[in-house]
């Protein structure tokens, strides 16, 4: 896109990949696309050619279905940080052990967990040298070593920062009924 949101270049992703989040890494001159149906990160060059794929886990190879609901990422130098609904891969069994996992881009594998105990996290960001993430279902903005720095009464995602203020979108979660009374979300 240009500054007026005119599409300058585009490319289709592989079939059944469901690209869900994207980040460009200046240090490595690569795009990272989080694909929730693949439980993987696609690495693309500047011309959008797929260079590689990094699996979040091997679970998809055994059961032929995604398990982690990976959705967004941010990268810094040789690491890519991916948010997901379930670190264990059991969100479909109502185990929302959400996390941000670090992927080593040289080794092409998951190497650590940056944050845990998140409920449907989205939009990990590095802002002024610090990590931030939306703990979406709880309606929390996390920062300052992943402490809650803001709480909002709706499902939150789409984090941006202009140097002074944070911006995000609030929406209704599709599965709200089972969460009534558990969190501070009031939108139904």
Q: What are these language model-derived features?
A:
Residues 1-188:
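Sequence-structural signature of mature extracellular/luminal beta-sheet repeat domains
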